[in-house]
C-alpha cells in the first residue's frame, strides 16, 4: 500500500516544490527519529495519462513493525480536526483544531473524533492519552511524570524539525492536525510521527512553537525546552546552513532526478537556511530555558565529607 503525493505538480494544491516533505524526513532520520519511506513514481490509471507523483509508505502496521518492537500492538492515533454538524442535512458544520486539552471526562467519545484510533481499534483504549491531557490540565507536569507518559526526546526532536521548517499546518506549530501520535506497547511513551509536511519553507517569521492548549504547556516545560535546544543546535550545526552533508545530499538528489521532470530546488532551501538561522538561534537562547546555573541552598558551613545538593 502507498499514499500518493502530488506536491511539485500542477495538481499539488498550492504545494509547489517536490522536496519539501522529503527534506523534513531527511532532517529527522539522522537525528534518530523513525520516518516512513518514499519514492518518486510515474502513475497511470486505466487509459489516463502518466502522472509524476511521490509514493509514501503509510503510517500503519508495516511501518510500525519495521520501526518498533511489537509495533502494531502499540496505540496509534491520527490527528485531525474535530467536526460538529449542526444541521440534519450536513451542510452546516463547525470545526476546531485538535489539541491536548482535557475535556473534563474520561469518556473516549469526547476525544475520538480528532484523535482517530488507527491500531487496535477493537480495544478502543484511550486511557493513556486521556491521562496525559488530564496531567497537563492539572499542571502535574513534573519531569518524572512526563517522562513516564511521553517520550520527551522524540517529541522534542519532532517539534524542532517541524518548527524550523515553519510547518504551520501541524499540531506543534499552528494547526491541530497532520501528524500521528503513537505509544509503543513496550518501552517509551507517546511520540509524534511525521506526516503531511508539505506546507513548509515559506513563512520566514513563523514561530517555532504554537499555542495549542496542552501542547504549549508540554513543550514550554524547562526540561522539554532543554531537549528542544539540544536538537535545534544539532540541526543547525550539522544539517542546515553551510552543512557539507546536506549540500552533498541535495547535489546527489539533483543528479539522480535529472531529466525526470522532478526539480530539486536547492537554492530555495539554502536561502531558507540563511533566513531561518536567526529565529532558530533566538529560540535556543531565549531566557525561558537558559537560566544561569546557581546554587541557592543556604550557605552554611559543613564538616561532612560528602553533601547532597537538592
Which residues fall in each region the model found?
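Middle-to-C-terminal accessory/interaction subdomains
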Residues: 13, 111-306
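Internal "kinase-insert"/substrate-recognition segments embedded within catalytic cores
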Residues: 2-11, 17, 30-36, 48-165, ...
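Alpha-glucan (starch/glycogen) binding determinants
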Residues: 310
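TRNA-binding/sensing appendages of the translation machinery
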Residues: 16-17, 21-28
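Alpha-helical scaffold elements adjacent to nucleotide-binding pockets in ATP/GTP-utilizing enzyme cores
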Residues: 23, 55-59, 227
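Short, well-structured active-site flanking segments
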Residues: 36-37, 174
Amino acid at each position: 500500500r502507498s499514499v500518493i503525493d502530488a506536491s511539485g505538480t500542477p495538481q499539488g494544491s498550492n504545494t509547489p516544490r517536490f522536496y519539501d516533505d522529503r527534506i523534513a524526513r531527511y532532517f529527522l532520520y539522522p537525528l534518530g527519529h523513525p520516518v516512513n519511506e518514499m519514492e518518486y513514481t510515474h502513475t497511470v490509471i486505466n487509459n489516463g495519462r502518466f502522472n509524476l507523483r511521490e509514493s509514501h509508505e503509510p503510517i500503519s502496521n508495516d511501518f510500525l513493525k519495521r520501526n518498533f518492537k511489537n509495533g502494531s500492538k502499540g496505540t496509534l492515533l491520527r490527528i485531525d480536526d474535530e467536526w460538529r454538524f449542526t444541521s440534519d442535512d450536513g451542510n452546516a458544520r463547525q470545526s476546531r483544531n485538535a489539541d491536548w486539552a482535557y475535556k473534563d471526562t474520561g469518556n473516549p467519545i469526547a476525544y475520538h473524533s480528532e484523535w482517530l484510533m488507527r491500531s487496535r481499534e477493537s480495544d478502543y483504549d484511550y486511557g493513556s492519552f486521556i491521562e496525559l491531557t488530564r496531567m497537563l490540565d492539572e499542571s502535574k507536569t513534573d519531569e518524572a511524570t512526563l517522562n513516564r507518559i511521553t517520550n520527551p526526546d522524540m517529541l522534542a526532536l519532532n517539534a524542532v524539525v517541524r518548527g524550523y521548517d515553519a510547518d504551520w499546518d501541524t499540531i506543534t506549530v499552528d494547526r491541530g492536525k497532520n501528524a500521528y501520535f503513537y505509544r509503543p506497547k513496550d518501552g517509551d511513551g507517546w511520540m509524534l510521527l511525521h506526516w503531511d509536511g508539505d506546507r513548509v519553507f515559506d513563512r520566514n517569521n513563523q514561530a517555532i512553537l504554537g499555542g495549542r492548549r496542552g501542547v504549549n504547556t508540554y513543550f514550554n516545560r524547562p526540561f522539554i525546552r532543554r531537549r528542544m535546544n539540544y536538537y535545534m543546535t544539532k540541526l543547525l550545526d550539522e544539517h542546515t546552513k553551510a552543512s557539507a552533508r546536506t549540500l552533498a545530499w541535495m547535489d546527489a538528489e539533483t543528479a539522480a532526478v535529472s531529466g525526470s521532470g522532478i526539480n530539486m530546488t536547492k537554492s530555495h532551501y539554502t536561502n531558507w537556511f540563511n533566513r531561518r538561522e536567526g529565529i532558530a538561534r533566538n529560540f535556543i537562547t531565549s531566557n525561558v530555558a537558559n537560566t544561569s546555573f546557581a546554587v541557592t541552598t543556604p550557605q552554611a558551613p559543613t564538616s561532612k565529607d560528602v553533601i547532597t545538593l537538592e
